[in-house]
């Protein structure tokens, strides 16, 4: 699950299960799971999973916000490709800027400060053809 938590999106089959089971065997989720899970699903939900090593099924993982979509196993690759096509249809520079701001602003607790932050991908976007052409496409 630690690798999955590092992903931007998760599309899961109905039979997928998620857990950080390390405490059950005297270990700890040292590959980022203990830091990422609380940020993604809130402290109480994360502690409930992390302190018990409890497994959650795909439907509960969707409710908690761990996964974006749950599909039947035979449809998994089609769903992943659909998400990829939707992202691919967007401006690469906009995607880069969105990801940079979203992830870097996690480190700033103050929303106003994070909104005033300087982000290189945003600066690059504002100077790009995408920024000029984008509004024209909406007109």
Labelled PLM ranges:
Residues 42, 57, 72-75:
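Short loop/turn segments at beta->alpha junctions
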Residues 33-36, 45, 97, 118-121, ...:
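Hydrophobic alpha-helical segments typical of transmembrane helices
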Residues 130-131, 137:
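Interdomain hinge/lid region at the active-site interface
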Residues 54-60:
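Acidic, divalent-metal-coordinating active-site segment for phosphoryl/phosphodiester hydrolysis
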Residues 11-16, 67-116, 123-129:
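C-terminal long alpha-helix characteristic of the crotonase
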Residues 1-51, 64, 79, 83:
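CoA-thioester-processing core
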Residues 49-50, 98-101, 138:
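Short alpha-helical scaffolding segments that buttress acidic/His motifs in well-ordered protein cores
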């Amino acid at each position: 699950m630690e690798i999955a938590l590092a992903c931007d999106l998760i599309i899961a089959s109905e039979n997928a299960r998620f857990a950080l089971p390390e405490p059950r065997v005297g270990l700890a989720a040292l590959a980022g799971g203990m830091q990422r899970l609380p940020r993604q699903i809130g402290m109480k939900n994360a502690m409930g999973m992390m302190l018990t090593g409890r497994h959650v099924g795909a439907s509960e993982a969707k409710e908690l916000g761990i996964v974006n979509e749950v599909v039947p196993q035979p449809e998994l690759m089609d769903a992943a490709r659909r998400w990829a096509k939707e992202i691919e249809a967007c401006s690469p520079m906009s995607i880069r800027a969105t990801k940079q701001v979203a992830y870097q602003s996690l480190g700033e607790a103050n929303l106003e400060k994070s909104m005033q932050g300087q982000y290189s991908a945003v600066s690059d976007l504002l100077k790009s053809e995408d920024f000029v052409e984008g509004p024209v496409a909406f007109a």
